[in-house]
Structures are given as C-alpha cells and as structure tokens.
C-alpha cells in the first residue's frame, strides 16, 4: 500500500476491497475545460498548456487532445516563425475537404487584411466565398472573355509612377513574365520545348511591340506580324546574313506554333485584348469552370495565363508599396489542381516555377493543392519529375489528408513520417461505411481531417468542422443538390 509523505495510507484508485471499502469497477475521467491563460492562471497546479500553435487562422481541433489549432502560411511565417517559407502544400484524395481547408484559411486571412487571390478556379470552389468577402469574380472560358498574354496589365501603369531603378526593374520583370507566358503557351500547344533561339526571338519581338503599341493593345496576332515582317532586332538573332530565305526558315517553326494559338478555342481565349483586367483591390477569383474537363490543353493554358497575370499584378502592387506610393499589402494566392498544368507538356515545370517563385520579401503566402504526390512524379521526363517534387520540398509545411498506402513512400522522400502518422493518414482514405437503416453512406472517416507536418517535427492531426455561413459558401457539391 502506498503512503502519503505524512505516513497516512493512500487508498487504491478504485477504493478498498471488502464491505464498506468503497470499491468501484469504473473510475470516470475528471471533467476538462478549456480557457485562456488569463482565465486559468489561478488554478495551478491543475492547468496544463495544450502545446498546439495558437497563431494564425483557427482551422480546427487537435484530434488527440481537443485543443484549438491555428494554422496558415502567412502567420506561421510572419508572426510565429514556425516555417521558413510562407507556403503550404495540401494533399489528399478527392472529397476529403482540401478546398474547404483552403477556403477556411483564405476567409480567416481576409479578416486580417490579407487579400485571397484564386487565379484559376476550376469548379469553381471559391467564387461564393470571394463574393461573400466583398471581392470580385472574373469569368474566363469558351465565350466568356479573353486574356491577352502580351498585356503588361498593372505593371505598365505602375511603372509610369516609378522612377530610376525601380521603374527599370518593373519593366524588365513585366517583359520576363510575358516572355515566360508566350514560351509556355507555345510549349504546351506543340507539346515540345521552346529552344533558346526561339525564346530570344520572342523577347526581341516583344520589345519591338512595346515600342510600337500602347500597353495592352498588341496581341499574339501582332506578334506573328512582327515575325513575318522581320525587323532588324529580330532578324539579327537568326544570323540570316541578309538572306531572306534563311530568315524564313529560322522563324518558320515559331511563327507556325504561335499562329496555331490563334485558332479554335485557343484563339477565342488568347487572340484578342483582355476583356476584364485583374484588379487587385480586394479578394479575387478567376472562374474558369466554363472550360470542360475534356479540353485539358485549353484548361491548362488558361490556368497558366491566369497565374501569370495574377503574379504580375502582385509584383506591380508591391513595387508601388516599396516606393512608398501605395500601402503595403499582403496576398494569399491559391494554385489549385497544379498538376493539370505540369503534365500538359514538357518543360512546363520550369515555366510554372518561373511564374510562381516569389521570395519571402514580396508579401505573398501561397497554397498549392494536389491529389497525391503521384501527380508530380507521373510527368514525362525525369528532369521534370525531380523539379516538380521541389514544389512540395520547398513548401513551408504540408497539410496531408487521406492518401493511399502506396503514397507513403513518396511522402517519405519529402517529409519525415512516423509509423503511427502514416497509419493515421492512410486510414483516412478508407471508404465510408454503409448505413443499412437509412440506406445511405456515412461520412467518410477522413473528411475534414488533416495532418500538419513541418519537416521532421511531429505532425498535428486536426479535425476541421464547417460552421455557420461556411456551410453554404464552401459547398463543392452544389450541382448534386435538387
């Protein structure tokens, strides 16, 4: 029998055996309450800290302890210092709540003055949320507007307000982004990489167009016209030595590829001036749900163009802020279904990386959404596969929902998972049970559940539950309702 320090016997936790001993077969757990440190500070030694992050957007509760968990890439980087890069990757099979998690984070950040930008919303998952936050929704697709990839957008308007090196840097950045976009669209459409000479020809032609046309007026039609005319800055790169036939042979492939972009659905989307410019005066969603899932090439092209325009507008806004001409702003950008663009053609990993590589000083948090890492390692070349995995490796942290068991080996190459963590996330991928009485499926075991992983640190298993207005604005199955 144990004894108290004073020598008094301490009864067993179930009481003494025998008559009058108070023996019980069940000992109930003590009741628990949660409150702030200020409220519970006088209850020592009965209070215990939860140990979960309390900085950022409240996303749910720790599955093990019930403690509140706060998480978002902006606050975890900016205020908590938990991650080295303000970005996150969300992984999980369809139907587990990836879009709802991103929507919860976007809504919370919007309340803190961080503008959510969704440049390429396929279903759309976030249009209702954007409207509820007072933002704007731009529609693109077949018969729903055009996006001119040669339009410098906000960059030229911002450059006119700048001087010196700041002006030159922004103009050079705008030229580089347009060059990347045209090269990416050509590579995507021809399903072959753009050569270094072709890229130099595009850059020279863009410079000629900038000198001849007001910002936003030149389109891919005029770009083909410059290649056809062959002005000296362009002709010089072909080493034609005054031979017109040699020049025609040198530009024929590129001219044909850009000309192909002007035909059919591609032409409807990219051959004219921009219908609705992206104005970053608040939350923004670009709804491209009008493009059918069967038109994968057009879908990937429009997504890529939207990303390019959005990142260009962000760069212009930050350049004005750095010069003291506008207030400093923070953005949260969501790249959903990223794999659709990466697998659309060889070399597009580099193009996407060039468009999205914003450093920590530019005030941009980012969420990249995949189904599984197999989306990245199923690309055509080993070089592309290696570079694509870098998107997950460089992310500040991962939010892992239910994934198949076959995914664990790939995940282990990116982040350290313990045995119990691996078992947990694979159990979330199990199919739902069947309610024989109601004749319907029960909720899937992994819905709303995520494991937050930062490098080799122990993961935080979180259960997210939608509340109040979220139930309506984050409903991704609207078309199935009667």
Which role does the model predict for each range below?
Residues 75-77, 81-96, 103-106, 292-428, ...:
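Conserved P-loop NTPase motor cores
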Residues 78, 97, 124-128, 145-147, ...:
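Flexible loop/turn segments at secondary-structure boundaries
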Residues 29-30, 41-43, 49, 96, ...:
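Loop-rich catalytic cores of soluble enzymes, especially ATP-dependent carboxylate-amine ligases
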Residues 137-139, 283-285, 398-400:
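Conserved beta-strand scaffold positions in the cores of enzyme catalytic domains, especially
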Residues 165-218, 380-482:
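P-loop NTPase motor core of the ASCE superfamily
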Residues 44-64, 131-133, 155-364, 440-444, ...:
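P-loop NTPase motor domains
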Residues 71, 80, 87-93, 104-206:
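Switch/coupling segment of Walker-type NTPase motor domains
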Residues 1-89, 481-482:
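Basic- and hydrophobic-enriched, low-structure N-terminal and domain-boundary segments
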């Amino acid at each position: 029998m144990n004894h108290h320090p004073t020598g008094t016997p301490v009864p067993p936790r179930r009481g003494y055996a025998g008559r009058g001993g108070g023996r019980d077969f069940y000992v109930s757990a003590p009741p628990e309450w949660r409150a702030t440190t200020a409220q519970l500070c006088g209850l020592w030694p009965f209070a215990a800290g939860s140990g979960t992050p309390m900085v950022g957007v409240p996303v749910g509760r720790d599955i093990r302890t019930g403690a509140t968990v706060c998480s978002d890439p902006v606050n975890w980087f900016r205020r908590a210092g938990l991650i080295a890069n303000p970005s996150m990757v969300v992984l999980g099979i369809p139907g587990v709540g990836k879009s709802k998690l991103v929507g919860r984070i976007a809504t919370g950040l919007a309340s803190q003055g961080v503008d959510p930008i969704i440049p390429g919303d396929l279903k759309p998952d976030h249009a209702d949320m954007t409207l509820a936050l007072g933002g704007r929704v731009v529609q693109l697709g077949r018969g729903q507007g055009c996006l001119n990839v040669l339009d410098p957008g906000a960059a030229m308007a911002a450059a006119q307000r700048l001087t010196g090196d700041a002006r030159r840097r922004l103009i050079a950045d705008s030229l580089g982004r347009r060059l990347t976009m045209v090269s990416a669209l050509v590579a995507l459409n021809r399903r072959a990489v753009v050569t270094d000479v072709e890229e130099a020809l595009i850059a020279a032609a863009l410079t000629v167009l900038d000198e001849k046309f007001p910002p936003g007026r030149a389109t891919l039609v005029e770009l083909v016209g410059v290649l056809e005319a062959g002005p000296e800055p362009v002709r010089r790169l072909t080493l034609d030595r005054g031979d017109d036939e040699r020049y025609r042979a040198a530009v024929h492939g590129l001219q044909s590829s850009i000309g192909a972009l002007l035909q059919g659905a591609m032409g409807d989307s990219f051959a004219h001036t921009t219908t609705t410019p992206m104005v970053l005066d608040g939350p923004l969603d670009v709804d491209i749900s009008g493009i059918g899932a069967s038109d994968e090439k057009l879908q990937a092209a429009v997504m890529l163009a939207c990303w390019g325009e959005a990142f260009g507008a962000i760069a212009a806004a930050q350049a004005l802020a750095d010069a003291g001409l506008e207030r400093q702003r923070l953005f949260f950008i969501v790249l959903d279904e990223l794999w659709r663009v990466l697998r659309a053609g060889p070399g597009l990993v580099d193009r996407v990386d060039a468009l999205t590589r914003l450093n920590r000083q530019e005030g941009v948090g980012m969420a990249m959404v995949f189904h599984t890492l197999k989306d990245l390692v199923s690309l055509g070349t080993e070089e592309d596969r290696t570079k694509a995995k870098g998107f997950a490796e460089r992310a500040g942290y991962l939010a892992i929902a239910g994934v198949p068991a076959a995914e664990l080996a790939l995940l282990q190459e990116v982040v350290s998972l313990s045995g119990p963590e691996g078992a947990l996330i694979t159990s979330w991928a199990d199919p739902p049970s069947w309610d024989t009485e109601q004749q319907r499926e029960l909720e899937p075991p992994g819905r709303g559940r995520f494991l937050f992983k930062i490098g080799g640190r122990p993961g935080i298993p979180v259960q997210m539950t939608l509340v109040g207005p979220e139930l309506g604005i984050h409903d991704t199955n609207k078309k199935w309702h009667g």
